[in-house]
């Protein structure tokens, strides 16, 4: 598959790093050289990648959401125990300095008697111009030559490509 110019530039900075289009091939070829795995891919791929990594004895940090269903999470919890690994679901927004600063102020006694915290979000998809009221699958479009659509779909049922599914719009 053809690579985007910005991707090619980054790849050229690390010419000796192995690259794989499919995580299963990566584990097949070099699982013994991997200490831990970070999963930051479309939501529907979190479960299969996390399970595969744990089956290889790898600790896993998986981005939110950890999985799509409670059943997937229960399977992950059993796998974590079975394979003796540590697995964590993270949220980069809740791992930033402001949260640690608040904790330090609270522990120092500068902030006392917190009874409630109210948070607001100004849009259901504030990072994208995406219509949250979609009622049907978008029309199919040609798959870009830089994308392996079948691998991207992974465990999802097949449907035609549309740019609205790509670059963070799969939710």
Regions found by a protein language model. Give the residues of each.
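N-terminal glycine-/serine-/threonine-rich beta1-alpha1-beta2 phosphate-ribose binding loop
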Residues: 2-59, 71-86
């Amino acid at each position: 598959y053809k690579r985007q110019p910005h991707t090619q530039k980054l790849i050229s900075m690390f010419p000796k790093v192995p690259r794989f289009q499919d995580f299963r091939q990566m584990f097949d070829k070099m699982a013994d050289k991997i200490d831990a795995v970070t999963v930051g891919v479309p939501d529907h791929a979190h479960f299969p990648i996390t399970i595969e990594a744990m089956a290889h004895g790898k600790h896993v940090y998986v981005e939110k959401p950890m999985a799509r269903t409670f059943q997937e999470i229960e399977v992950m919890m059993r796998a974590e125990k079975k394979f003796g690994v540590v697995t964590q679901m993270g949220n980069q927004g809740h791992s930033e300095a402001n949260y640690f600063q608040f904790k330090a102020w609270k522990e120092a006694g500068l902030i006392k008697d917190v009874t409630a915290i109210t948070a607001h979000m100004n849009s259901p998809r504030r990072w994208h111009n995406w219509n949250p009221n979609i009622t049907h699958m978008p029309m199919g479009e040609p798959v870009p030559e830089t994308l392996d659509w079948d691998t991207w779909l992974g465990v999802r049922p097949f449907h035609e490509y549309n740019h609205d599914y790509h670059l963070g719009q799969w939710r």
